[in-house]
Amino acid sequence: MKPIVAGVAGTVLLAGAIFVGTIVSDKISVDSNVGEQEATVQTQLPTTAAAQSVVYAPPSIEEVPDGPMKEAILYGYELVNNTHVAADEYVGNQLSCTSCHAGAGYDEQTSSLVGVMANYPQYIGRSGSIVTIEERINGCMVRSMNGKKFEMNSDELEAMVAYFAYISEGVPIGAKREWAGTSDMKNVPIPNVADGEELYAQSCIACHAADGSGTDANTGPALWGENSFNDGAGMARMSKMAGYIQNNMPIGTAGTLTDQEASDLAAFILSQDRPEWANHDKDWPKGGRPNDIMDKEKREQIKNGTIDWEKVLSTN
């Protein structure tokens, strides 16, 4: 049975929203060169010793204090760590949030979600609007999870937000999360797909399987095929995939791949068939659509040898 968290979570989140709104309304600037060309709203906080000394120190999921929020936080953790099972009616593949955000977002080195509440609301160029943390979660649900959105008042969504709020304790709104960084590769070299295929066979199949179908959602997720992310997900971009591979793979020896090797691997993985995003035409409504989104057209160009890699990588 799903826990009933809406009333409790809503009360706490409302208080948080009032706090966030007070700060955000003070001063907001938009940087159009952030991340995957998804301009980010950055809240400008006073320069204080506390704001400058934010460290990675999330509270333990093993020590969630007793109280009205405990059930919601623990349910949120389960949803993040085991998404395709805990929220199976919403997920269209065999991935979990942990597939990319290791340790349910706790891992300091792998796309950490610790302190994520400090970065929302945020302007996302892909949607052409300012989005809340709830909207960002739902964006992942329909793209990375190839599924459907949670209802805005659902137990699932409110539990996930409660969990993110918990692991964001001590991180002020607008603070720079040094541990989060960005997985983008800024200058992706022209890839060699054949070399990427060879490298995949040598180094990746033990966890991700020869056919890319994966062996476990959290330790060896599907990289292509029907159980992977669709081509509207951020990871379907060359700059994102190559950067993620170089920063995090192979497990145990992350950071050892060259730019060229990471690019080769990314190109091979993204050349494979995967679910198609139905709303490419609605993305980037205000312009700035990057060229390195590896959609069906580009996958076919790779297969028939007509892809113009210089053009694809020209925005990175």
Segments from the language model and where they lie:
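Sequence/structural segment immediately N-terminal to covalent heme-attachment motifs in c-type
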Residues: 68-104, 188-220, 224, 238-239
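Post-cleavage N-terminal segment of exported redox proteins
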Residues: 1-77, 83, 122-193, 302-316
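Surface-exposed patches in mature extracellular/periplasmic domains of secreted proteins
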Residues: 85-92, 148-153, 174-177, 253-259, ...
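Short helix/strand-bridging catalytic loops that position acidic/His residues to coordinate divalent metals
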Residues: 181-188, 220-232
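Short sequence/structural segments immediately N-terminal
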Residues: 30-37, 90-95, 106-107
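A cross-kingdom marker for long, charged
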Residues: 276-316
